[in-house]
């Protein structure tokens, strides 16, 4: 049992750092086990005379320390496990330190570490302190110059900014020097050294400047980086057109690494990417991989302005860069891949991750007020809900005023570390609007619930809407205030005609009433169009109204939403023991009509075919029964497969593409619908369907179709599963990114023996627990996306996850902490399951030498 109590960091305690670090000169003498790092800091006092200089530093061996060239005696400084302190520092001086570190033993993958025989870094949020002594906080901006010395077997020596010198050294070594003219915080520092292939291109900015583009990858992988490089050029062009942002250095580099805790990192001029989000070709990457690469390349590039040029004053302001940048990358994806389809995908992800977060013990505001480890706040709330707040701001202000606010923010705060308050102030000033109430979205946790009741007066031709809002208590916030919620509303007639186009109603109080005149007939309400606010909506709509929306709504998000709501209600009523056989048949008929709508794109139809997920359905209950939900959902899947079998088989054939592979949205949409039909048909595995599915998998000529065929085979179990998995592994056993997919498909296996198989897979020769991609592919997929088997009545699934968390925590606390979340929802499940989940959380918290990362999340989950 732990006896120490880690100290929380509180927003209220923020104080500016009392010194400026005007320039930082770093010299790296790279060696896998004994790297020497020399740091020369130009320091100037900006705070009180009596304040000491306190620098962060962890796992560093101090070799030397000097001020203005004079070595310090032992009594002139102090060093402990987390910091270096100089009690009596001069007002202006040059501090020189030399430390020794061991990159090869760094399995936490924070700071400087080895991956695939190369050196690389990850410094956000607090990794730089494991490289050298420094004020490792985002409000200390410094101009960096870097010299890297290494053996010739590491031919590429890369860092931030522009290259300024390179050459040979004695003993087969060489060097490179880099200079970054833009002040940056330590979390944006980056270094890569290794044997890499490079793919080169250029981009001409809107002012006519030529920027060299370089993507560095493992030898032999350059062709797989072509799509990422093309995505980068599209992102650079889009940001110029949409936000007026131009790139500022002469060189932009991206490096792919296999071992990486995050998806990617926006280091100034030297982005480092998880290889799973950079490398793609039709044979090894799915359409989803292509989508993610396009979005993440854009996200990290967009950070050059929303994160790098303007950064966060402190880590409580993390949403300032992440929420805004997610909003921006979603905008690019909408323009590239279709606004409605992209919006549906974004909202599905928001509900699956962020709504669940808001509904549980880990709920926190978009701008938190305290933390133990900031690593734990890289959450869906910060990112996705943060983006939704920006989207609402644009809806409330209108596009022109929103753009004025963005321009003012970029102009006013360029080169600063700033706050959410300063951000919102720019939009208030640019629009002339009072946005003080809007700030509540940043301070208040929880998902608001909005109710709309309608009353139609036929004689007067008037519709009255009564809107109410409320937010349930969340940890530390028992009382909630009304928030300004933009509700996009339109009206349809019973035959699907448009009666009233979309209008924004701003619900900014607990209850309000809106009256609309000149409504000639009883309307069907289409509310929260485009998912205009991150809320749970309840209306007095009848099933017949929802079928009108499902068949005719001009807002495609709400058309999809109506279908999801109808399916959800049918699944929930069956799970509760009151099946609606007539309703299930009516739903299947309506779905069939939607699937033959020639005006609808295949990508949209694929989304219509996907039933609500079991985790999303569980959020509808106070004491969910995963087994009952799984059985009820499977029943509806089977009803659809039987009722629409001929149509599904016809669409499956029609959507086949025989020509050359294209990654564009139209071709991806056809593949998505074809694979959705295959998965739907697997719910009715008679001989004709089985033969079709075997043919789908066997004839697949790209990874999208191969994975689309593999999962139905796995779901069937028995001989089809074993043969398909064996053949896939044999074909792709030397491709790490494809093997991740092989593990992930088995993590989703719905068969009763799935848990036993997943546990066995952790002993498979290809399972790499120290690689976050492989760990997430199997363990995280099982715990998050296979609820029927994770929630095994014996509790064995929970024990397995707890075992993995404790194993991984010993060497990679950040990745271990991200595995805690599936146990955190224990209150939402029936007591016999919830008690077993809670017991595993208690076991985790009681474990000796537990990291702060895991302790914080597990303790909060227990409440």
From Swiss-Prot:
It comes from the Bacteria. NCBIfam families: pepN_proteo. Coiled coil: none annotated. This is Aminopeptidase N. Its EC number is 3.4.11.2. SUPFAM superfamilies: Leukotriene A4 hydrolase N-terminal domain, Metalloproteases ('zincins'), catalytic domain. InterPro entries: Aminopeptidase_N-like_N, Aminopeptidase_N-like_N_sf, PepN_Ig-like_sf, Peptidase_M1, Peptidase_M1_dom, Peptidase_M1_pepN, Peptidase_M1_pepN_C, Peptidase_M1_pepN_C_sf. Zn(2+) binds at residues 299, 303, 322. It catalyses: Release of an N-terminal amino acid, Xaa-|-Yaa- from a peptide, amide or arylamide. Xaa is preferably Ala, but may be most amino acids including Pro (slow action). When a terminal hydrophobic residue is followed by a prolyl residue, the two may be released as an intact Xaa-Pro dipeptide. Belongs to the peptidase M1 family. Its cofactor is Zn(2+). One of its GO terms (biological process) is proteolysis.
């Amino acid at each position: 049992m732990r006896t120490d109590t880690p100290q929380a960091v509180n927003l209220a305690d923020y104080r500016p750092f009392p010194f400026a670090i005007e320039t930082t000169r770093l010299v790296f003498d790279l060696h896998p086990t004994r790297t020497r790092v020399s740091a020369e800091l130009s320091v100037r006092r900006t705070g009180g005379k009596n304040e000491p200089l306190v620098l962060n530093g962890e796992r560093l061996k101090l070799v030397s320390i000097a001020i203005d060239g004079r070595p310090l005696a032992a009594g002139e400084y102090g060093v402990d496990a987390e910091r270096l302190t100089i009690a009596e520092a001069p007002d202006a001086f040059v501090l020189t330190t030399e430390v020794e570190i061991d990159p090869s033993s760094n399995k936490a993958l924070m700071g400087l570490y080895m991956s695939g025989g190369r050196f690389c870094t990850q410094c956000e949020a607090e990794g730089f302190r494991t490289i050298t002594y420094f004020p490792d906080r985002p409000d200390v901006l410094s101009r960096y110059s870097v010299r890297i010395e290494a053996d010739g077997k590491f031919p590429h020596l890369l860092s931030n900014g522009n290259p300024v010198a390179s050459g040979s050294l004695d003993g087969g070594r060489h060097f490179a020097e880099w200079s970054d003219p833009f002040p940056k915080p330590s979390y944006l520092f980056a270094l890569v050294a290794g044997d890499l292939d490079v793919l080169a291109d250029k981009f001409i900015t809107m002012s006519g400047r030529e920027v060299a583009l370089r993507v560095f990858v493992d030898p032999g992988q350059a062709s797989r980086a072509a799509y990422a490089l093309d995505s980068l050029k599209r992102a650079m062009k889009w940001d110029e057109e949409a936000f007026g942002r131009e790139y500022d250095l002469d060189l932009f580099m991206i490096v792919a690494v296999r071992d990486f805790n995050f998806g990617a990192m926006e280091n100034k001029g030297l982005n480092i990417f998880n290889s799973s989000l950079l490398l793609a070709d039709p044979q090894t990457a799915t359409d989803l991989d292509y989508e993610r690469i396009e979005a993440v390349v854009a996200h990290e590039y967009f950070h050059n302005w929303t994160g790098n040029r303007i950064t966060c004053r402190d880590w409580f302001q993390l949403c300032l860069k992440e929420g805004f940048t997610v909003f921006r990358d979603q905008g690019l994806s909408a323009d590239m891949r279709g606004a409605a389809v992209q919006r549906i995908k974004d909202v599905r992800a928001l509900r699956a991750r962020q709504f669940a977060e808001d509904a549980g013990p880990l709920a926190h505001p978009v701008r938190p007020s305290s933390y133990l480890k900031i690593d734990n706040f890289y959450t869906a709330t910060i990112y996705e809900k943060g983006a939704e707040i920006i989207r609402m701001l644009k809806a409330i202000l209108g596009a022109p005023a929103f753009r004025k606010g963005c321009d003012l923010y970029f102009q006013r705060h360029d080169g600063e570390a700033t706050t959410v308050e300063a951000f919102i102030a720019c939009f208030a000033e640019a629009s002339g609007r009072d946005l003080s109430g809007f700030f509540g979205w940043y301070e208040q946790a929880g998902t608001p619930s909005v109710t709309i009741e309608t009353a139609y007066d036929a004689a007067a031709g008037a519709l009255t809407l009564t809107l109410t809002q409320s937010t349930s208590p969340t940890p530390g916030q028992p009382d909630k205030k009304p928030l300004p919620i933009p509700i996009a509303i339109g009206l349809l007639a019973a035959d699907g005609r448009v009666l009233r186009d979309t209008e924004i109603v701003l619900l900014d109080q607990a209850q309000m009433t809106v009256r609309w005149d000149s409504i000639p007939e009883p309307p069907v309400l289409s509310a929260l169009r485009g998912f205009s606010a991150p809320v749970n909506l309840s209306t007095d709509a009848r099933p017949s109204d929802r079928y009108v929306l499902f068949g005719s709504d001009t807002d495609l998000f709400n058309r999809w939403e109506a279908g999801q709501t109808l399916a959800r209600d049918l699944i929930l009523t069956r799970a509760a023991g009151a099946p609606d056989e007539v309703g299930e048949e009516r739903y299947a008929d309506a779905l069939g009509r939607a699937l033959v709508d020639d005006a609808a794109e295949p990508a949209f139809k694929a989304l219509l075919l996907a039933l609500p997920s079991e985790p999303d359905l569980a959020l509808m209950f106070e004491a969910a029964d995963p087994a009952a939900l799984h059985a009820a959902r499977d029943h509806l899947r089977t009803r659809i497969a039987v009722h629409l079998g001929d149509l599904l088989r016809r669409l499956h054939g029609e959507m086949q593409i025989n020509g050359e592979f294209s990654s564009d949205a139209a071709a991806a949409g056809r593949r998505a619908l074809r694979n959705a039909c295959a998965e739907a048909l697997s719910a009715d595995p008679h001989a004709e369907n089985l033969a079709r599915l075997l043919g789908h998998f066997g004839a697949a000529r790209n990874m999208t179709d191969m994975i689309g065929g593999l999962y139905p085979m796995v779901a069937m179990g028995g001989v089809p599963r074993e043969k398909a998995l064996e053949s896939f592994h044999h074909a792709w056993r030397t491709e790490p990114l494809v093997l991740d997919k092989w593990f992930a498909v088995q993590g989703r296996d719905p068969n009763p023996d799935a848990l036993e198989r997943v546990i066995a897979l952790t002993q498979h020769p290809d399972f790499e627990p120290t690689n976050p991609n492989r760990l997430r592919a199997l363990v995280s997929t099982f715990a998050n996306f296979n609820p029927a088997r994770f929630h095994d009545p014996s509790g064995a699934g929970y024990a397995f996850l707890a075992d993995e968390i404790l194993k991984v925590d010993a060497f990679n606390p950040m990745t271990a902490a991200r595995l805690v979340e599936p146990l955190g929802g224990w209150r939402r499940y029936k007591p016999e399951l919830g008690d077993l989940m809670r017991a595993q959380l208690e076991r985790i918290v009681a474990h000796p030498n537990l990291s702060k990362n895991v302790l914080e999340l597990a303790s909060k989950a227990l409440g």
